Amino acid sequence: MDYKETLLMPQTEFPMRGNLPKREPEMQKKWEEMDIYRKVQERTKGRPLFVLHDGPPYANGDIHMGHALNKILKDIIVRYKSMSGFCAPYVPGWDTHGLPIETALTKQGVDRKSMSVAEFRKLCEQYAYEQIDNQRQQFKRLGVRGDWDNPYITLKPEYEAQQIKVFGEMAKKGLIYKGLKPVYWSPSSESALAEAEIEYKDKRSPSIYVAFPVKDGKGVLQGDERIVIWTTTPWTIPANLAIAVHPDLDYYIVEANGQKYVVAAALAESVAKEVGWEAWSVVKTVKGKELEYVVAKHPFYERDSLVVCGEHVTTDAGTGCVHTAPGHGEDDFIVGQKYGLPVLCPVDERGYMTEEAPGFAGMFYDEANKAITQKLEEVGALLKLSFITHSYPHDWRTKQPTIFRATTQWFASIDKIRDQLLDAIKETKWVPEWGEIRIHNMVRDRGDWCISRQRAWGVPIPVFYGENGEPIITDETIEHVSNLFRQYGSNVWFEREAKDLLPEGFTHPSSPNGLFTKETDIMDVWFDSGSSHQAVLVERDDLERPADLYLEGSDQYRGWFNSSLSTAVAVTGKAPYKGVLSHGFVLDGEGRKMSKSLGNVVVPAKVMEQLGADILRLWVASVDYQADVRISDNILKQVSEVYRKIRNTFRFMLGNLFDFDPNQNAVPVGELGELDRYMLAKLNKLIAKVKKAYDSYDFAAVYHEMNHFCTVELSAFYLDMAKDILYIEAADCRARRAVQTVLYETVVALAKLIAPILPHTADEVWEHIPNRKEQVESVQLTDMPEPMAIDGEEALLAKWDAFMDVRDDILKALENARNEKVIGKSLTASVTVYPKDEVRALLASINEDLRQLLIVSAFSVADESYDAAPAEAERLNHVAVIVRPAEGETCERCWTVTPDVGRDESHPTLCPRCAHIVNEHYSA
């Protein structure tokens, strides 16, 4: 007889290899056919709502690793929430206006000068939709579940209509104003930029020390002194109207090289060194406030430069006397307003000097640096020229330097709502906690928000002008424009005359003849996405404001978190979110930024093509995403190895359930043996830990707990030990059904617990669970497992955890014996232990077969104590152990070594247990 035929070996169609790149798209097709998103929403209808509001990615180009990290994190949360008592809709969105799309079209050869603004905007819209379709497919390939057929898009009419209402509401509260003000200006984009559109990069600039001759010393100075300033922007010298000093600082009048100079006392030493005064002496000391209203002379124009006082002056660098050009700096502008100085800005929108800078008109500002420095040298005002490399603001899109330039712009007042904003920040939960400090400081220190842009592709600023140039914004005009946009989209603004955009019969005191013009600037794109709390959360029936969570990269403290907060507090007085969670950036394996030049870019599409989305998702779960994270082929290899172990654990459990029906074969929990109950108690512990980790967005803990449970608790212990029962015993034997009961409960619970992270694999496992109690087609339509009721659970855990420590000792002794060639496999061993007293009682209380638990052929507890163990025994923590080769023959069926093999003459190669099973169940 072939005894192999009498073994109950595992059977399952669940494949050992994931082959995810091929299998995942098939699974996704199935989800689409069953309309899984709608099914989940229907099943969870009426539960408390949990809204994770999607920050919209920009609709341009393929998705990168940062997108993948972001969308997968969101998906894990949404999937978990919908399996734990919430209705968790997920509406993805796209940000679609702005310069990158204009630039992309220009690169494609579109000549925007040859068409109307409205025509150009139609091409922009078409391009945006193409990009959305491309990105949507890539996001879906990641396994992200959402309302992909009805996303929110910032260029959709209903979105724009709500955005106009946000603007109108802010205007009504006096928070929108038009003003001349220095703003970040990008000559390369020919537009104003918001702070969120600025990035700092190193730039080489000239560093000059310039002497301004004193014209009127106002009785404090004699009139033969020269005030020394320092600047790295010589091109702003033509716009100089003042010199700022700090009222409370001491200033020296210094004599050097036969001349007298004014510098801050604290900086005199460093200035002398820098400009090369070898012998210098202090003639007089004065306070900054004494110098107020002293008149100096512009170095090369016939014009005065007034000494003014400003709190912004520091002694960090320079001379303590600050060159002040109100048209080219925020502090300069503010101090200029205080002293009634004009706002002079002799630079045009392309960065070229104008006629207001005689002698330099027509020069690009950066080129003018040289000519102006030469002019200063000619007139004897230049004390020193050198070059420095410093961190300087650049346009985040064109990567070119920006300048400060005073222009007429539309602003949203931050100042008027600053206290409310800071209160709203306090009431929000920020994770990580440093996020709160970061956004608090940003809001505390930021200026008013410049919301106008001089571009074509964006939402128009809905303002009309009367015949006298007065801006008109009324409830009536806002309501009308909002309705027009809802009906026709914002292109209508560029297709119609002002009169056709106003309500029928509209009149206004500023236009006695009924003539109106319209604003041509558009809104900053951050105003677009920043209005989503109204344009999406309020607009849609399935969502609500405030959202439970905003989750984006840490660059969004100054971006979307900030603009959303500003508009929401302005309109509603409250934050648009209850909680904000931020993640770091994706770096390469060595912690470097990814760049084409370094050749270290990891592309999500490629990872999915080679390894699958579930591997990428498992990587996301494995990292500490609140800081910057690393990815490389090597890191993904390690993650794939963990995936393989988890998958193999599932496969083993599924394979050993092939003949198990939980409705008929399950053993009630109360009737299970201690070890089986212990495993269910361990499963209970896992369920509690994993759910707690999901609740606190600690996915790395989920990853580690699941990995540990599969490899240590299951594979290395219970499943290994259970083979002897599962394969060897008769099919319907009580011990075998007990183990299968544990496996069934475990496989169902693990499939659910891992489903938010590995949705494809979890559903594949789900399909292969034989005779499932829950007859639903996807694990996504179930809830997270609940712990089972187990009598005396804590005592059980304490007892068996203690046994596991003893087992570790014995395994160590077996390992040593194997290395010393005393035994081969552990089943060839006979083990004798000499326990410490408390361990003796523990071993005596165990009813299970200790041979089976330790996978050895003979096991005995010696009468002698630990201390009295013979010299040959290996002394370990809890027991002393002697390992010898087991005596007897090897049973052909179960591989146990015993002297009793062949006792049943009809089965000369079997042990009595196997002979009995074969006689009872397999004899013809």
From Swiss-Prot:
Q: What is known of its domains?
A: IleRS has two distinct active sites: one for aminoacylation and one for editing. The misactivated valine is translocated from the active site to the editing site, which sterically excludes the correctly activated isoleucine. The single editing site contains two valyl binding pockets, one specific for each substrate (Val-AMP or Val-tRNA(Ile)).
Q: InterPro entries this protein is in?
A: aa-tRNA-synth_I_CS, aa-tRNA-synth_Ia, Anticodon_Ile_BEm, Ile-tRNA-ligase, Ile-tRNA-ligase_type1, Ile-tRNA_ligase, M/V/L/I-tRNA-synth_anticd-bd, Rossmann-like_a/b/a_fold
Assembly with partners or alone: Monomer.
The protein's required cofactors: Zn(2+)
Q: What is the organism of origin for this protein?
A: Geobacillus thermodenitrificans (strain NG80-2)
Catalysed reaction, written as an equation: tRNA(Ile) + L-isoleucine + ATP = L-isoleucyl-tRNA(Ile) + AMP + diphosphate
Per UniProt, subcellular location reads as:
Cytoplasm
Please state what the protein is called: Isoleucine--tRNA ligase
Annotated NCBIfam families: ileS
Q: Which family does this protein fall into?
A: Belongs to the class-I aminoacyl-tRNA synthetase family. IleS type 1 subfamily.
Q: What is the lineage of its organism?
A: Bacteria, Bacillati, Bacillota, Bacilli, Bacillales
Which residues are involved in binding ATP?
K596
